[in-house]
Structure formats: structure tokens, C-alpha cells
């Protein structure tokens, strides 16, 4: 686990390249997610008046492939970002190796199911 604020410190603390890449991913994905979600909130709640937010308007918006990809990008990045953050917590609080393996296995299965159901739900509209 890397507990660093700067890239130099992170590189010194990393036990593997994968751990360093996850550390970098968390910084980049957090920044990207911030702009994606702010854009989504603006386009969904500020740009559209409340009277125009009908079921048909939402279905028409989600029929657009660009809007589907935008939502899928938010879904996939947020699940990866959240799963990696939860991995840090699991490593910190589940001390026993066998228990940690079980907790991670169940957790990653739930994340995979959320991703699969979210993707199917998003692209079936």
C-alpha cells in the first residue's frame, strides 16, 4: 500500500509497478470523475428545466450513443475508483490473509455484477 502525497514518495514506497500504477490511476480518475460528474449534473439538472424533464425526454437522451458512452464512462471509472479505494480499506482492516481473500473475492464479484448490470441496463435502452 502506498501512503504518499507526491509521485517521488509513491515511487519509493511502491512494492510493485502495479501498485504505483494504481496510485497514479486514483489521482487521474478522481480528477476526470469530478469533471464528468459536474458536467452530468449541469446537463441533467441545470441546462434542462423541470417541466422538460419527462420520461420521453430522458429516453430520447439515452438513445444517443454519445450520451450512453458518457454515462458508461462515469459508471466504469467510478466503479474502478471506488473498488480500488475499498481495496485499501480491506487491506487496512481485514488482518487475516484467508479472510482478506474471501472479502476481496466477494467484493470484486459484487463490483463485477454492478458493472455488468449497469452496462446492460444502459445499453438496452
Where are these regions (language model features)?
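Membrane-embedded alpha-helical bundles that constitute the cytochrome b-like, heme-associated redox core
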Residues: 1-125
Amino acid at each position: 500500500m502506498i501512503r504518499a502525497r507526491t509521485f517521488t514518495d509513491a515511487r519509493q514506497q511502491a512494492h510493485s509497478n502495479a501498485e504505483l500504477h494504481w496510485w497514479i490511476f486514483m489521482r487521474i480518475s478522481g480528477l476526470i470523475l469530478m469533471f464528468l460528474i459536474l458536467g452530468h449534473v449541469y446537463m441533467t439538472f441545470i441546462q434542462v428545466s423541470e417541466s422538460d424533464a419527462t420520461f420521453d425526454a430522458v429516453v430520447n437522451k439515452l438513445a444517443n450513443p454519445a450520451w450512453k458512452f458518457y454515462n458508461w464512462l462515469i459508471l466504469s471509472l467510478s466503479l474502478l475508483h471506488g473498488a480500488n479505494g475499498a481495496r485499501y480499506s480491506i487491506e487496512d482492516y481485514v488482518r487475516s490473509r484467508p479472510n482478506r481473500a474471501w472479502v476481496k473475492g466477494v467484493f470484486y464479484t459484487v463490483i463485477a455484477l454492478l458493472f455488468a448490470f449497469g452496462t446492460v441496463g444502459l445499453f438496452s435502452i
